[in-house]
Each structure stands twice: as structure tokens, then as C-alpha cells.
């Protein structure tokens, strides 16, 4: 009190008491205001509730992804007799082998998707193709906001529950530094999870589909808040990716999709769940040793069956692929287009929707609409191959000889614009940036699609994508 008296020299007795009383009132009122400001509702303070910071995560593939589908230029090998091997029936306890990214993202979540009307993306191999920081810088220079990284699960979990995350973590950091959004595409279960094998060992789901949900959950837990989309499998209408005793099976795939969707959304509702993109096959083929076993199925038929089984309720976006063969993107399969100089004659001598980028993607959309849904497409792989300037070309990819580098550039850009204008495509990923750098040579089916040549120099499509408008 003595301090107050010294600061109030000259006041009379009554005035002093009044001043003291007034001071006490101000102290009490100020304290109440301070308390309410800290603890009161955010909306009353004119502030937004805290939101998580949106960052980026990625993973990559130790091996390559198919650059084209069998119905578009390659033959699908027949399966042979199966050999049974024991398979663990329990979901393994996850074990972290390397890295600590999960701890850094422990409490964050991805902001709910939906504000972006169209996402421009590209597939990148950020582990096997060199320094991920360099490649993410190239994506940024292209002006693209999304990267696709395929995860061949079998390459990273040799032992149940033990995943080597080191390559994943490096790519996550590189993408985060560039502010890129990431779509994981997960495919190919480890051999220990599957009982069916044959002489032509290929990708397959696990016997216990719960293992897929477990792996998806571990991905989200580790990179929570930095994964923006996950594609659940890849080209599951081919036994190349669904090599099981029963063969291609839409029922089992949709069950896998439901389990994966639940595992992902329960951890991070903001992640875009994409159904596995189908391969445009142009027909159906059965195993010559087992006529009841389908080794590939027409994509329109498979899509219709997925829809009947409720797949649209287990995804945010319907995955789609089309690698454009030697037809321009705006040409329908049945309009009589012909290129008399073409070496690869499939689209001209045997017309079918599967040859046409336009007809295939519009056909998917029409089937979704017919089911009463407005679910968008996510085109997780598209592009045109050109072998111009290469010393060779992949077997079965004669169409890559028909497309010049200038046509590749023109058609890649045109396809992006068409998908943007359609309004029913949410994300589109060009195939691919840098698979030419994996060291597999001109017979690699992925290399003719790449924007980077074998010598590391940009091909014309690189500059065309960089310079195209991206509204």
C-alpha cells in the first residue's frame, strides 16, 4: 500500500479510499477478461480453431511399375501349376527398422480434401532413380503439385512386421521441402503372406486381406498428416498384379478396398482413398490350364462388377489408367481414325475402346453416373510413349516407334487440358518423370514414357509440361 500512497501524493483521506477502491475494481475486471481470453471459445475471440499444418510424405518403389498394360501391346503369360507354402495367419506387430518420422507426425492429420478442383501430378521413382531431392526439385520446376510414388510392398517387408522405412523417409523429406502433395500407390504383397506360387511369379494380394489394412494403417501412422492420397492396389484386373489360385476376382478386391478404406480413414479422414486403377485390356482371357481361372478381365466389365459390389462406397475417387498407344487423346475408338504410316496397327485394324484415352475414361465416368454417383476419377497413370532417339524399344511396344517426341509432348499436354475441362477428373498423374534413370536400358517398358532421357537431358515433353497453363 505504501507504494500506492507515494504515487498518489496530494490526495485527501476520502479521495485516497475512493482511489483504492477503484483500483481494486479494475484489477478484478482485468483478471476476469484475461481468464476468459485464454480459456473462452475460439469463435468468440474472432479466431479460427487450430488446424494441422499440411505437409507431405512419400514412398517409392524398389523396382519398376508397368508402363503399359497387356491389352495395349504386350502378351499376358499363362500361369502354371501352383505350389503351396505356409502363410502366417495373424497380422504382425509392426516393427520400425529405421527412421523416426512417425514420432514427428504423431498428432497431425491431413486437411480434408475437396478445395482443389483438379490436381496436376507426375509419377516419380525417388528411391531407385537417384537423389530424391533432385527429382522433387524437377517436379517443382514443372509446376506440378502432386507426385505419385508406387510402393511395391513386397520389397520393403521381407520379414513380417519389419519394414525398412529408410528410403521412404528420404523421399518424404525431399517432397516436404518442396511443398508437394503425395499419392502412394500400394501393390504386391510379400511372399510370406501368400500361399499360391507358380512358375511365373508375379504380384499378388495376401491370403489374409487384413494384412493389407494393417500395412495401410502403418503407412498412415508413420506419415500421418503428410500423405494426401493412397491408391489401393494397381491394375487388379490382371493376374500380373492379382496372381492367385482363383485368378482375377473383383469380389475379393472390393473386400480389400473396404478394409483398407476403414484402416486409412480411421487414422486420417483427410486422405483421399483411390480405388486401384484398372488396365484397359480389350477383352478377357482364361488360364489354358484352368478355364475357370481368369488371368485378365475387360476393364469395363470389371468396373461394372466393382460398382455392383459397392466399391463406390469404399473410396473417394475411382482410379483409372490409360497409356495412349498411338492414338491422339481426343480420338474416340469408333470414329474411323487411321494412321496409314503406323507400324502398330491395333487401334486401326482391331478397334476397341481400350485403345482410346478418350473412350476409356469417358466410359468409366458413364458407368459411375449410371450407378447414380458423382464419384470423380483419379487418373493415376497416363501418357504417350516415344522411342525416338533410343537405340531400341521394349518388346511389344511397337507403338512407341510411331510416336515422335513432339507428338508425345503435344498429347501429354492436350490430355491434361481435356481432363481439367471435363470436370469429372480430380487428380491426374503423368507417367513418368525419371524411370529412364533406373539403368534398365531401352527395353524397359517405362523408359519411352519418361520426360527425362537416358542421358539425363529433358525431352521435349518436359518443357511442354513446364510451360503449359495450369489453371
Go through the PLM ranges and name each one.
Residues 29-47:
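Hydrophobic single-pass membrane-insertion segments
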Residues 113-117, 209, 213, 248-402:
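Noncatalytic carbohydrate-binding groove/subsite architecture in carbohydrate-active enzymes
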Residues 47-67, 74-114:
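Ser/Thr-rich, Proline-interspersed low-complexity disordered segments
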Residues 118-124, 147-149, 182-186, 228-232, ...:
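Hydrophobic faces of well-ordered beta-strands that scaffold small-molecule active sites
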Residues 3-5, 19, 23, 222, ...:
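Aromatic-rich peripheral "rim/lid" segments of glycoside hydrolase catalytic domains that contact
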Residues 126-141, 211-219, 296-308, 409-418:
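Short, acidic/polar
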Residues 139-290, 384-387, 435-439:
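Substrate-binding cleft and catalytic face of glycoside hydrolase catalytic domains
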Residues 104-145, 150:
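Boundary/entry segment of secreted carbohydrate-active catalytic domains
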Amino acid at each position: 500500500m505504501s507504494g500506492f500512497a507515494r504515487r498518489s501524493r496530494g490526495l485527501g483521506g476520502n479521495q485516497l479510499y475512493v482511489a483504492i477502491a477503484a483500483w481494486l475494481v479494475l484489477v478484478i475486471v482485468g483478471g476476469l477478461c484475461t481468464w476468459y481470453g485464454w480459456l473462452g471459445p475460439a469463435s468468440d475471440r474472432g479466431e479460427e480453431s487450430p488446424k494441422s499444418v499440411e505437409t507431405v510424405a512419400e514412398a517409392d518403389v524398389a523396382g519398376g511399375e508397368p508402363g503399359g498394360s497387356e491389352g495395349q501391346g504386350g502378351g499376358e503369360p499363362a500361369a502354371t501349376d501352383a505350389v503351396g507354402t505356409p502363410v502366417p495367419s495373424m497380422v504382425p506387430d509392426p516393427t520400425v527398422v529405421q527412421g523416426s518420422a512417425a514420432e514427428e507426425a504423431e498428432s497431425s492429420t491431413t486437411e480434408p480434401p475437396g478445395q482443389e478442383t483438379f490436381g496436376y501430378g507426375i509419377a516419380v521413382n525417388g528411391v531407385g532413380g537417384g537423389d530424391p531431392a533432385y527429382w522433387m526439385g524437377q517436379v517443382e520446376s514443372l509446376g506440378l503439385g502432386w507426385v505419385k510414388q508406387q510402393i511395391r510392398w513386397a520389397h520393403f517387408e521381407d520379414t513380417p512386421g519389419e519394414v525398412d522405412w529408410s528410403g521412404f523417409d528420404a523421399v518424404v523429406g525431399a517432397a516436404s521441402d518442396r511443398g508437394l502433395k503425395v499419392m502412394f500407390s500400394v501393390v504386391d504383397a510379400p511372399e510370406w503372406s501368400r500361399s499360391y506360387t507358380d512358375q511365373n511369379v508375379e504380384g499378388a494380394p495376401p491370403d489374409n486381406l487384413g494384412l493389407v489394412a494393417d500395412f495401410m494403417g502403418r503407412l498412415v501412422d508413420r506419415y500421418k498428416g503428410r500423405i494426401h492420397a493412397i491408391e489401393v492396389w494397381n491394375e487388379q484386373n490382371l493376374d500380373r498384379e492379382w496372381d492367385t489360385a482363383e485368378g482375377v476376382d473383383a469380389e475379393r478386391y472390393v473386400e480389400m478396398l473396404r478394409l483398407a478404406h476403414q484402416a486409412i480413414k480411421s487414422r486420417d479422414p483427410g486422405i483421399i482413398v483411390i480405388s486401384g486403377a484398372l488396365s484397359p485390356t480389350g477383352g478377357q482371357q482364361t488360364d489354358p490350364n484352368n478355364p475357370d481361372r481368369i488371368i485378365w478381365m475387360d476393364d469395363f466389365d470389371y468396373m461394372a462388377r466393382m460398382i455392383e459390389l459397392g466399391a463406390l462406397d469404399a473410396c473417394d475417387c475411382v482410379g483409372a489408367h490409360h497409356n495412349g498407344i498411338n492414338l491422339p487423346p481426343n480420338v474416340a475408338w469408333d470414329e474411323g481414325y487411321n494412321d496409314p504410316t503406323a507400324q502398330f496397327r491395333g487401334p486401326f485394324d482391331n478397334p476397341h475402346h481400350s485403345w482410346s484415352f478418350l473412350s476409356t475414361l469417358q466410359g468409366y465416368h458413364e458407368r459411375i453416373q449410371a450407378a447414380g454417383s458423382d464419384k470423380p476419377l483419379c487418373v493415376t497413370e497416363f501418357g504417350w510413349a516415344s522411342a525416338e532417339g533410343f537405340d531400341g524399344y521394349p518388346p511389344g511396344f511397337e507403338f512407341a516407334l510411331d510416336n515422335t517426341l513432339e507428338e508425345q509432348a503435344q498429347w501429354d499436354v492436350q490430355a491434361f487440358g481435356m481432363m481439367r475441362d471435363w470436370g469429372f477428373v480430380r487428380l491426374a498423374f503423368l507417367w513418368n518423370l525419371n524411370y529412364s534413370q533406373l539403368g534398365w536400358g531401352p527395353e524397359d517398358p517405362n523408359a519411352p514414357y519418361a520426360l527425362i532421357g537416358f542421358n539425363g537431358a529433358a525431352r521435349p515433353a518436359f518443357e511442354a509440361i513446364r510451360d503449359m497453363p495450369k489453371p
